[in-house]
Amino acid sequence: MGQHQSRDDSHGGDRHRHHDAGTSGPTSPSDHDPYPSRTGRGSRRNLVASIVGGGSNNELPERKETAAERQMRRLERERVARVEERERSIREEHVDGGYLVTMGVYTGPEDFNKAIVRQLMIERRVAPFWRGLEDYESDWTEHQLVAAGRGLPIPAADEIPSEDSARPHSSNSTNAPSSNLQNLTVPIASRSQSASYDTSVGRSPSHSSFNTSSPTSPLNAPATSTSLLRPRAKTLGLKSSSKEPSASDSAPREIQLPRDSQVNGQAIEAFLYKDAVECSICLIFYPPYLNRTRCCDQSICSECFVQIKRPDPHTPEHHGPPQPAPDQAEDTEMLVSEPAACPYCQRPEFGVTYEPPPFRRGLVYAKPSRELANFSSAMSSSSSITSPPITSPGLAPRVDNRRRATSLSANDSNVITTDRIRPDWSAKLEAANLRKAKKNAAASALHAAAYVLPGTSENRSYVFGRSRFGRNRSDPDNSGSATPSNRDTSSRTAAESSGQARREGRDSHAARRTRDVEDMMMAEAIRLSIVAEEERKKKAEKEAAKEAAKNAKKQAKEDKKKEKKERKSIYGTNGHSASSSMLNLGNSLAATLTGRRRGDSVASNLATEVTPEEVEEPLQGKGKGVAHPYLGNDGSATDNGLLGTQHLDPSTSSSLLETHQSIPSPTSPDKPSHLRQMSTASSASSSVAESGNGTNPQGSSTSIESPGVTDTNEGNEDGDTGAESMFNFRSLTAMIEKENDNEKTDAVHVENAHEASGSRRGSPDETASQDMDVSMETLRPRDSPQQPKPDHHVPMGLQMPAPKIDTSIVTPQLTLTPDTPALMSPTEENGKQLGSNLQNLSNNEISQ
């Protein structure tokens, strides 16, 4: 850098020396040396200075600026430039009292085209950016309206206005003939447009030549004004160095109208804000000259209008109304961006129209548009209030606030749509689609690369590119062979043959690659199927294990509930009824001694229980010759009529009593009464008695002996001399005949039967002796009442009479009937059913 700067300085110094020499006199030949830097000692001094300067710069290495810092610095410069331009525009430019820049209602980014908006505002096709009022009162005075329109503090209503706001007219605006709009153009022969004029923006700074407030401004006819523009055209035509002469010539040129702050004798701010209206979107008061929507004719300010735009490009499945079918099939995957909808009625293709105020102030174009050409006159400070109305339909003054009856088309010339102020929406949409296409192509390439064999990866991109665009086809429509050429036939034939060979090679390679891809896809499909099957099996096993655990838990819960119910039931194993214990004892004893058990009986136990009504009746017992023990407070078994019994083996009794500890209650509602249990008990007793006569192979004792019971019965009324055995067997026929004589016997209470398997529960061995003592204690009578006369009458219902005890008895009396009949025929066996006539049947006794 230092060397280049030194050379430039040396060249500059040489040029100055040449210029001085040329002006002073003749020059020497050395002055015209084309390479002055190569000769002379000055160049050496500059070279040494540059080296020294470079060395000094190397001592402090300068820090390089990053791209982010450059970007931030550039954005900051642009922001400062925008702020300055905004302040300048507000200070120097306006259109009918409005401004060409936003007033800060919205703080978001301004992404609309400012040049187009500026042009539309100068053409009076869009309302300018009015200064908004936060508050508005309809009874404000003129100087209050002026202060509000200028952004000043609003004074009191009775305050004397200042001279600037109270001055009705300008000193330079008293000439009435100079208020014609057609004569407002100024001569521009003395001012030519610079080559750096920005045609896209179309801005012209305020110059003193545009200030037409001077009374010396020329007032010429339209033809004269046209002739005044002719030198400008000649000047532009002679400029050969201009890069865009046609654009500069066609762009409209801005001019400043005479500065007049009065309209109809009052300030322009008072004229604009005396009938202020509120924008329904931003809720700010503006002059009544606002934009009107083309569809529903609603008011909307320019601040809100420039913020409405199309949505960003997105996929087409997120919007409601169906779009027309695309021409190509691939367009269905393209991004879309719908036109902006009206904020009031939600109709698409949002656009506005504008009716300007009935006067012109500020900037206009030198080449008036169609509306400005038809504009006949403008209202000025010196115009009469009763002046004729404007004849132009587009610029007619607002007569009333009647709404438009019909909506305008989006293609109407007076309608400005949101796409008009944002013409780059199509470019943004195309850019978004291009980015999506590139992303899809990259994803497709990555997906295809996963299925390419390693040996064929080098030619993949070339084949893919050739086959994608169809350049490997041999038809003349897609190749250049159909175009006539001047080449030799032989060379063309050789080229065609070589091209055909290359195409065949590519085709074979593509076919081989296709087969490889298909094989890989098949293998991948098989692998995925195997993985899916394994996952399914694992899931099924898991479900089965879960179901099994659930069933086990449910079964355990049911068992626990059943066990709890059995414990709570009166037939459960927790009861301590002596009668049930003894009945179970008799049944178990019979089964143990005889080695046989009746399997066709529903129940195997029978017990009798004394009801409270039978307590005071005399004791009477009936049965098959078996005396019922009377359990009193004192006395022996001989007084109670208990027959002599033999001793029972302690081991047998403990094993029998081990499983019988409770008796079911006869009043239980859930256990039905089975009268057939009598025969079952009788069969068991018979078997026990038969075994006691000498048939027990083990030779153990088969009789039960209670403490305090003798071998003889002294009080026997039948005259028996010896002790009658407890297990005395008689003929069933004799018992029935004997029973006919004693029909008037007391009622017998029969205890409900229950299943032996449901009421049995084993007890520990250490408690067997205690249970035996408890069971034997129930057989010990305490009183010795008179032995009742045995009665062998058996009722037809196979009911066994219960003994009558007095009130002093606490433990119920038991009756053991371990009689087991001999084998019977089916006819005799059925005779034990309810209602059968047992008198006509015969029973075979077991005889030894």
Swiss-Prot record:
Major place of residence: cytoplasm
Location within or outside the cell: Cytoplasm
Keywords, ordered alphabetically: Cytoplasm
Record CDD domains: SIP5-like
Biased composition (Low complexity): 204-218, 239-250, 378-393, 679-691, 833-848
Cytoplasm as UniProt keyword: yes
Keyword Cytoplasm in record: yes
GO cellular component: cytoplasm
Biased composition (Basic and acidic residues): 1-13, 501-518, 541-569, 736-764, 779-794
Bias kind Polar residues: ranges: 168-203, 477-500, 571-582, 648-670, 692-713
Region feature Disordered, mapped onto this chain: 1-67, 154-260, 312-332, 378-411, 466-518, 541-582, 595-800, 813-848
Similarity comment: family membership: Belongs to the SIP5 family.
Biological function: May negatively regulate the snf1 kinase.
Protein name: Protein sip5
Gene source species: Botryotinia fuckeliana (strain B05.10)
